[in-house]
């Protein structure tokens, strides 16, 4: 388009900011160097750690049994593979061989959003042991932060609203408080130690499935 001498020449178009999730994900997935303890005798095994008293190279046998104790399926993995990671293979094999399976009973290590969703979506029931929530030491109990499903917010022990902020890449919805309110909160030391005076509460997008597992735990049938 022609322009007068007094006019400034057109500026080159600004480069559009790329907001595609693939590129963002690629930046997040840059490989990081980490140290792995490996056995020189048997490199295929893994370092099994249980608390602070037990550390040894080992294999784990992830076993599924029926109500009478008969073994239905076993999957062997290195000792550093978590139970919840090995669950899919064991579960898929058992349900393929025994499709009539209705209820899955497991310990608290298997109470993850993914496993809960997988089992209930298959039309089965998952009943797990109690899993203690991870909360700040010496702080408010977890149950004092109440989720309001209708307004999609969290109510703190001081009856203030934590509004939805974002959903992180791990599938957790983050609810954050208003720092202006938290600054003068009488129980802030029991709630958060963040420098910006913001309390963040996370709730997984599949939390409803975990609550179904809790309901099954309180049901005598399971």
Task: Give each language-model segment a name.
Residues 1-222:
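Anion-binding and metal-coordination hotspots
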